[in-house]
């Protein structure tokens, strides 16, 4: 059986890094995504929550980056 999970802390760090490299503020990114809550982006970046798949696709487009370079996947075996 294959058991994977998304490392939300590292994924959040990737989102923050990509945003900063793009020269975008959190407010600007929020507006580009089309969401009303700035706190949502802060929560993603702190690793407290994951964006929806729709928002991940939008982030991938905004940053011109494949999803697998935004999302960090780990195997449960990595933590044993």
Language model segments and positions:
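Short, basic-rich loop-to-helix N-cap that marks the start of a DNA-contacting helix
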Residues: 47-58, 77-79
